[in-house]
Amino acid sequence: MSAALFCGPPPAVSFGCKDGRGRKGMVRSKDIVRQTVKPPAHACRLIGWNKYPGSVVPTNSSLSPSPTALDDDIELDLSPFLIIYKDGRIERLKGTTVIPACPEVATKDVIIDPATGVSVRLYLPNVVDLPSKKLPVLVYFHGGGFVIENTGSPNYHNYLTLLAAKSGLLIVSVNYRLAPEHPIPASFDDCMAGFNWVVSHSAGPAPEPWLARHGDLTQILISGDSAGGTVTHYVLLRADAGVIEGAALVHPYFLGSKRLENQTEEDFEFHEKLWRLSTPNTEGLDDPLINPLAPGAPSLAGLKCKRAVVFVAELDFLVERGRMYYDALVKSGWGGEAELVHQEGVGHVFHLSDYSGDVSVDMMAKMVAFLRGE
């Protein structure tokens, strides 16, 4: 893999968990961008929680706290994701940096719905040496707890560039609207729209020439990490039968009202608050959107794909939920092929910031093999 395939250097320092368990051991990279937006007046007034304790203190950061960012001004602190102030401002602490699409590596951005602003970023591998046959298409949904990240985030752009080069697939990454400005189900609807936009190229005139010329629309796969894994499950239940060849759920963001043994009380409460912030009208952590195993949730037997793989990480807060999902899928009567990949000694979405470690290399190899059907 040549470094020339990247639009800029891979991130040197990730903003994540050293041990994968929630927010413990957080550090901030020097190039972090703080994004503050002013939402509609009604956007955050339903929040009734006090300031969340245990805020993360920036380490090795060039940023100084805002003079207005006093504790008394804060409505809800969901560090390291975002802070909501009493005047309605929303400050995102990570996942706001955008790497532009690079023609040199065959990437480009396309707006698919001007009304909502939903767009996709396409990755076309090895343009000069493309084979005469068309390429399978992977529709990808990024993570970020539904409140941060985008298709231009450095970690996602670099990872998907590498994945496209290694797998030889044409990748379509969906840039969906974020909560709380756009409460769930907006993100789910946007991802479904992105998927349907790709599928639409198989019938009639195709609006996107890359998909028309190079995409094999008889071989569509979908994947997502964390919140994107949650969306992947959502799309699998709603796609037309026979359209999706395979699905890869990476460290899926599945929750539930019962705290599991591997989950600390602090992390459990944090993610409950994050979910309620994103989904004001939710039924709670047993909402079928976030808990596919909740009573009344659609049967996993209804997943619309031929094969599926679930990746879990030993030190991830979500590891047991991922394993439970896999076990339930196998027992559901679903007629496809299921695989579980359990990786030890690593935490949540470790592969987005470490491309050269042994476990990351192994994960990439397993992902590529799955996407290729090997």
Swiss-Prot record:
Q: What else is known?
A: 6-tuliposide A and tuliposide A-converting enzyme, which are compartmentalized in the vacuoles and plastids respectively, come into contact with each other for the enzyme reaction releasing toxic tulipalin A upon cell disruption by pathogen infection or herbivore predation.
Q: Name one GO biological process term.
A: defense response
Record's catalysed reaction(s): 6-tuliposide A = tulipalin A + D-glucose
Originating organism:
Tulipa gesneriana
Entry EC number(s)? 4.2.99.22
Coiled-coil ranges from the UniProt annotation: none
**Where does the record say this protein resides?**
Plastid, Amyloplast
The UniProt family comment states:
Belongs to the AB hydrolase superfamily.
Task: List membrane-spanning regions.
Answer: none
Describe, as the record does, how this protein assembles with itself and its partners: Homodimer.
**Name of the molecule in the record:** Tuliposide A-converting enzyme b3, amyloplastic
Instruction: Tell me which tissues or organs this protein is expressed in.
Output: Highly expressed in pistil and bulb scales. Lower expression in stem, and barely detected in root, leaf, petal and stamen.
Q: What molecular function does GO assign, one term?
A: lyase activity
Report the superkingdom from the record: Eukaryota
Keywords of this protein's UniProt record, alphabetized? Amyloplast, Lyase, Plant defense, Plastid, Transit peptide
Any one annotated GO CC term? amyloplast
* Active-site residues, record numbering mapped to chain: S226, D316, H348
Q: Where is the transit peptide?
A: 1-68
- Gene3D superfamilies according to UniProt: alpha/beta hydrolase
Write out the function statement from the record. Answer: Lactone-forming carboxylesterases, specifically catalyzing intramolecular transesterification, but not hydrolysis. Involved in the biosynthesis of tulipalins, defensive chemicals that show antimicrobial activities against a broad range of strains of bacteria and fungi. Substrates are 6-tuliposide A > 6-tuliposide B.
